[in-house]
Design a protein with these regions (language model features):
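Extended, low-charge hydrophobic alpha-helical regions
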Residues: 362-366, 382, 423-464, 508, ...
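Canonical P-loop GTPase G-domain recognition
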Residues: 232-287
């Protein structure tokens, strides 16, 4: 019987994990090991993927992957241990403190002035970035979705200037399955930080401790931060920290990063272990008695075999031993074993497999989870089913229900756009426009009274106020849209959208995880492109990056709002929503084209942890909105201001630098006139339109500022309804801004960046031409 055949609500014991390569190793690292109990929670609304519970947490996987896992059904769970009944009064081991782990007389600190470097390592969605912000005072974005951090972030611990802490992408193990796992593993292995701060989600402790055990093998000073302890205690659970510290051999500090509780104590221990280079007391967690010590003997034999090679390669020997037993080719290549040693290694491993009755990877994973189970049985008072879990189950009955999930998603997105464009955002925009207009009148009167030079007067009023002011008025709409996107991500809903949409996205050749970068793309293409790093398949990553520009970013909102208010005032919300839908539809058609040509093959397997729903943090939402508002304002007073001044200058002077009365005689008209034949078939043959679209390559918001400067409010007399619609469609689809192209270049290289610019312009021209023909 396979996991695919197990009915909803039923439990079983895993007997065999099929498949091969990195995906199989990833399943084992996630706890899908022979002997583990698994329960089917539900199927996605479209029947695939499935959600299962294992080791106390929820995991999603496709039916095709579930078919590779053989099981034996059981009537009820048998290994759902309760842990200890109550926390014991165990003596504190005092690890990471002076006078206990070592004598004060024999302290040997690192030289004064040495930079103490730290790696902040933990599972995805365990609160790493929140802790990083508390440690450093930084304001990194925090979300409730696995994989928010997609690149390393560095900062200095507050109050300790000779420190540097690096927030690494969330990982489940030190196996190189995804690009973020490779980033984190390489940092620890190659850059050799002075210490590791391992953050563990105490509400999901068994899953998180798997990574802890691998980090202990790195032989680097380490402190374990038990995060979310406030939730554990709130659900009547507890952790015997002293016993856990003694069993792990490193300091263990209970904290709540969100509430800034226990962080100061964590810092003191982190500084101490790095300063005195206190490495883990224990690294040997294999049981000598387990299956006659088969795994124990294997690990120790391999340690002796590769010891000199590991030292030469600069890899911790215990870590190297378990990795080569698992079959990690990257580590094996670094060790450079000769033919005889390789043959001996394989002989040792095959003998262990024979005695243990499991293959090499499963045996090592089982050894780790076996120790974790013993550890938790002696140290953890199991909490009652958490309020967060109960609440999540109730919400999921609606938001991921078979018949309600898709309607709910559509309804939520429609509500978000309606509130943004017709209610909250529109009202705030009107308020800001009124303020800018009043200020413009006051400044105009002051400049006139002061008898300021006509050119300067024109620059300030017709250039800066008209251009930058018009763009600034769209700030409320952008902030409002980001507010709703932040609520969706912070609450944990976006992770459910990935689960619900996986089967649908698979039809166009993508994984459900690709929905996340695309949804982020509605905010800004730059972070959306970066978010693709969480995708484990290079094929999926490239395809998602190339499709992201079809998701209309907030920078285009000023263009839509400007033309809609002039040409379609009665149907504002409908036209704007229609543009978003059109972008998605064209993106879908292009995806089918990619699937059959450039990106043939199967999408990456869908393996993802579903976090509990959480109330969005007010501070986090405020932080995100401030960041987006600040970015927009910086752009408005840098790129857009410069673009506005340049456009004003070029359209105010001729080639001999004489001020012109008719802008048709200006430098700008001469240059932009070269492009007008290209845009004439779209009904956009005016040089001023071509100029504004060119300025949009620097920043999409500058399209509106350029139009305001060049037309001065008379654009309604120049364009027809059909040409305005064509311009909207062209703006929706043509090349992303220079910042987005730079991020694509960074991820895929110069060739792909150039291809994206040309390809998007071709698609935009064709779609705009068809739109003009249909309406005309």
């Amino acid at each position: 019987m396979t996991l695919k055949e197990l009915q909803i609500g039923k439990s079983a014991v895993i007997t065999k994990v099929g498949g091969e390569g990195a995906l199989r190793q990833h399943f084992l690292d996630m706890g899908m090991i022979p002997g583990a109990e698994v329960t089917v929670v539900k199927l996605a609304p479209m029947g695939d993927p499935m959600e299962v519970q294992i080791h106390g947490y929820e995991l999603t996987l496709r039916l095709a992957e579930a078919e590779e896992i053989e099981i034996e059904q059981i009537q009820k769970r048998t290994r759902d241990h309760r842990g200890i009944e109550q926390s014991k009064n165990t003596d504190h081991p005092g690890l990471g403190e002076s006078g206990k782990y070592h004598s004060r007389d024999h302290e040997n600190p690192v030289p004064e002035g040495t930079i103490l470097t730290y790696a902040l390592v933990g599972n995805q969605n365990c609160g790493k970035t929140t802790l990083f912000n508390q440690l450093t005072g930084a304001r990194q974005h925090v979300g409730n979705f696995p994989g928010v951090t997609v690149d390393r972030k560095d900062g200095v611990i507050r109050g300790y200037e000779n420190t540097e802490v690096t927030d690494l992408p969330g990982i489940y193990s030190m196996s190189p399955y995804s690009s973020e796992e490779i980033v984190s593993r390489n940092f620890v292995l190659n850059e050799k930080p002075r210490a590791i701060i391992n953050i563990v989600d105490a509400t999901n402790i068994e899953r998180n401790l798997y990574l802890t055990m691998q980090l202990l093998e790195m032989d680097i000073p380490m402190v374990v931060a038990l995060n979310m302890m406030d939730e554990v205690v709130g659900n009547q659970g507890a952790v015997d920290v002293n016993t856990m510290e003694a069993m792990l051999g490193v300091p263990v500090i209970p904290i709540s990063a969100a509430k800034n509780e226990g962080v100061d104590e964590l810092i003191r221990h982190a500084i101490h272990i790095a300063k005195y280079q206190e490495c883990p007391v224990k690294q040997d967690f294999c049981d000598k008695e387990d299956h006659n010590g088969a795994v124990h003997r294997c690990i120790h034999a391999v340690v002796h075999l590769i010891e000199d090679h590991a030292e030469e390669a600069g890899i911790p020997v215990r870590f190297a031993a378990t990795k080569v037993i698992e079959g990690d080719h990257l580590i094996l290549n670094q060790l450079k074993l000769d033919e005889n040693e390789t043959e001996m290694l394989e002989h040792i491993v095959s003998q262990m497999e024979k005695e243990r009755g499991l293959d090499r990877s499963a045996a090592i994973a089982d050894m780790r989870f076996d120790f974790i189970e013993r550890l938790c049985e002696q140290t953890v008072v199991k909490p009652k089913e958490s309020r967060e879990r109960v609440r999540s189950e109730k919400i999921d009955r609606v938001l991921t229900g078979k018949y309600t999930a898709i309607p709910c998603f559509i309804g939520i997105m429609v509500l978000v756009f309606y509130l943004t464009f017709n209610v909250i955002g529109a009202w705030l925009q009107g308020l800001l426009e009124w303020g800018i207009d009043k200020l413009s009148v006051i400044v105009d009167a002051a400049l006139t009274a002061m008898n300021v030079n006509a050119a300067i007067h024109s620059l300030v009023i017709d250039g800066i106020f008209t251009g930058v002011g018009s763009v600034l008025s769209f700030l409320p709409i952008i902030v409002t849209l980001f507010f709703f996107l932040s609520l969706m991500e912070d609450s944990g809903y976006i992770a459910r959208v990935a689960f619900v949409m996986d089967k649908l996205l698979r039809k166009i050749g993508l994984s459900g995880r690709s929905i996340v970068p695309m949804l982020i793309g509605f905010g800004c293409t730059v972070p959306a492109v970066m978010a693709t790093r969480t995708l484990t398949s290079e094929r999926d990553r490239k395809m998602t990056i190339l499709l992201t520009p079809f998701m209309s970013c907030t920078a285009k909102l000023p263009i839509y709002a400007f033309f809609v208010s002039v040409f379609f005032p009665k149907y504002g919300g409908l036209v704007m929503s229609g543009l978003y839908v059109l972008g998605i539809l064209i993106g879908t058609l292009i995806a089918f084209l990619y699937k059959g040509t450039l990106f043939k093959g199967k999408p990456v397997p869908f393996v993802m942890e579903l976090p509990n729903y959480r109330m969005p943090g007010i501070k986090n939402v405020e932080q995100l909105l401030w960041e987006k508002a600040k970015d927009f304002l910086q752009k408005a007073f840098s790129v857009i201001l410069i673009a506005t001044i340049v456009v004003w200058f070029l359209q105010s002077f001729d080639l001999h630098f004489n001020m012109v009365t008719d802008s048709a005689d200006s430098m700008l008209a001469k240059v932009a006139g070269l492009l007008t034949p290209l845009f004439a078939p779209l009904g956009l043959g005016d040089w001023r339109i071509c100029t504004s679209l060119l300025s949009g390559f620097m920043a999409k918001e500058s399209v509106v500022s350029t139009l305001e400067v060049l037309f001065g409010g008379d654009i309604g007399t120049v364009l027809t309804t059909s040409s305005a619609a064509a311009l909207l469609v062209f703006s929706l689809l043509y090349t992303p801004c220079v910042a987005a192209i730079a991020s694509i270049k960074r991820e895929l290289g110069s060739k792909w960046a150039v291809i994206v610019v040309i390809w998007q312009c071709v698609i935009a021209w064709a779609a705009a031409f068809i739109t003009h023909l249909l309406i005309h």
